């Protein structure tokens, strides 16, 4: 869904993403990194991140969401929750404002050549380069959205490109766990007045094409209007395979979680089991009516009862 970076050769592995929108979406409040000199640790606090469980009436149909192009397929998840309810009308849905196309240029000492709308890289060893933005910095922090396709001239070799410390890798087709990562996506925060970004091209012969680049301000990271109703967990009732707590729905809408969807998850609202749905394309949720409610989410492990009986 998010098309986050894929730094590993193994297509079954996924690292912690540096994408600030994905971090907000998954509720990552504290980000620990290193200073530019590599000597010290830094800590960034992101206040407006998604709660693990919340209520909202700001929803869009999955068919509407799936039709969105990059970068709106990322930014719209900061504004709306996605549901499988196809009866939801598109009326009133506002696309993320303030996103503008921008031109970018790769500069390197050797081995990097611009050809029409693409860039050809032919280098025998790792090459440092610079990515320059053609836009007014305005002295404020911004978000850069960058995406392009990679055509590998030597399919039996890996291709790796690091931009602003974010690595994407396309593995050799002969690799047992070929990752099929032919589209590299990078989303990053830029500091005020930052116009140049460090790039490292891995050795090989390959082409960058279909490049898309956009910038926006950081408003989308600061907006918490999606999380309209707060879920308050009960520490005594939440244990083992069960999460329980209260929520006051301000309007009819949906209960949204970042708990991966599984058919063995059960949701009860005020003691009554409700129909679970897949929300945000991958997580469990359900419909909710306005008012104060007690919610219990329980996971029933398949085969657990039989296993206990046998043992």
State what each model feature region is.
Residues 99-311:
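Active-site-proximal, structured, solvent-exposed surfaces of multi-pass membrane proteins
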Residues 21, 35, 238-239:
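Accessory terminal regions of nucleic-acid processing enzymes
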């Amino acid at each position: 869904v998010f098309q986050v970076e894929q730094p590993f050769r193994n297509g079954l592995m996924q690292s912690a993403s540096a994408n600030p929108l994905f971090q907000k979406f998954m509720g990552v409040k504290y980000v620990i990194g290193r200073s530019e000199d590599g000597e010290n640790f830094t800590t960034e606090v992101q206040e407006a991140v998604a709660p693990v469980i919340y209520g909202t009436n700001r929803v869009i149909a999955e068919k509407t969401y799936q039709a969105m192009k990059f970068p709106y397929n990322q930014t719209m998840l900061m504004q709306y929750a996605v549901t499988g309810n196809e009866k939801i009308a598109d009326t009133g849905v506002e696309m993320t404002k303030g996103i503008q196309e921008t031109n970018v240029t790769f500069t390197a000492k050797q081995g990097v050549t611009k050809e029409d709308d693409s860039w050809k890289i032919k280098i025998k060893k790792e090459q440092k380069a610079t990515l320059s933005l053609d836009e007014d910095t305005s002295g404020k922090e911004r978000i850069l959205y960058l995406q392009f396709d990679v055509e590998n001239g030597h399919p039996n070799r890996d291709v790796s490109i690091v931009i602003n410390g974010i690595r994407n890798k396309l593995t050799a087709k002969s690799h047992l766990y070929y990752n099929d990562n032919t589209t590299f996506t990078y989303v990053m925060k830029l500091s005020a007045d930052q116009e140049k970004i460090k790039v490292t091209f891995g050795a090989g012969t390959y082409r960058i094409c279909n490049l898309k680049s956009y910038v926006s301000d950081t408003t989308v990271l600061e907006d918490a209007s999606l999380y309209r109703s707060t879920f308050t967990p009960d520490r005594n009732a939440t244990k083992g395979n069960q999460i329980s707590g209260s929520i006051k729905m301000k309007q009819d809408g949906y209960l949204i979680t970042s708990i991966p969807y599984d058919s063995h998850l059960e949701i009860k609202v005020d003691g009554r089991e409700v129909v679970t749905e897949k929300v945000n394309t991958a997580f469990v949720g359900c419909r909710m009516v306005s008012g104060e409610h007690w919610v219990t989410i329980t996971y029933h492990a398949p085969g657990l009862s039989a296993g206990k009986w046998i043992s």
